[in-house]
């Protein structure tokens, strides 16, 4: 039976960068890897309402730099930067090394697979019909300029006794083309009928210059601009 390869893993080093950027000897590798996992687990839990898509971890000499990609940076920063300072101290306690936190804003959350999947999950948990949630996500992505999108939902849809799988696609989603910029992510909705899985593929276009033409880390927004978002989301 044929299986699909992971779209992100297949493109690593070709048109996609890693989410953990560091080198280690074999003795410390497992310890650092577990530290990365604990940091991501902590941030996902603390920033559950901040629409966090990616967490990139870099490890310069005896320190750690965490870049948080969020559609709502004001929630991450908090009042006068208090929340981000608490996050920095907590990560320092987890890793045992000095921590620097950068925040990158996601300008078009409709084109981010993780945020689209999380949005569908929140609708399913609010008992909105799954077909309506799928079509709304597809329409929003295509309106924002996506070349193609596919959404797949599996589980006890509508509370039926037998689990099934349904999907909806619009445009092109070329999974086998390595230069195709495919955003892929998954999320889970916990409903009264059980867990419903959501998968999202978004095709943004083709990258012809390879990985060298893509910035490894997006530039952090100036703090003055981030404070504007902070005031807006606090309202």
UniProtKB/Swiss-Prot annotation:
Single GO MF annotation: mRNA binding
Per UniProt, the keywords (alphabetical) are: Ribonucleoprotein, Ribosomal protein, RNA-binding, rRNA-binding
| BP terms from Gene Ontology | translation
KH type-2 domain residues are 39-107
List the GO cellular component terms. cytosolic small ribosomal subunit
PROSITE patterns hit by this protein: KH_TYPE_2, RIBOSOMAL_S3
Which InterPro entries does this chain map to?
KH_dom, KH_dom-like_a/b, KH_dom_type_2, KH_sf_prok-type, Ribosomal_S3_C_sf, Ribosomal_uS3_bac-typ, Ribosomal_uS3_C, Ribosomal_uS3_CS
* Pfam families for the chain: KH_2, Ribosomal_S3_C
- Family recorded in the similarity comment: Belongs to the universal ribosomal protein uS3 family.
Subunit note: Part of the 30S ribosomal subunit. Forms a tight complex with proteins S10 and S14.
Question: What does this protein's UniProt record list under function?
Answer: Binds the lower part of the 30S subunit head. Binds mRNA in the 70S ribosome, positioning it for translation.
The name of this protein is: Small ribosomal subunit protein uS3
Q: Which organism is it from?
A: Buchnera aphidicola subsp. Baizongia pistaciae (strain Bp)
Lineage, top ranks: Bacteria, Pseudomonadati, Pseudomonadota, Gammaproteobacteria, Enterobacterales
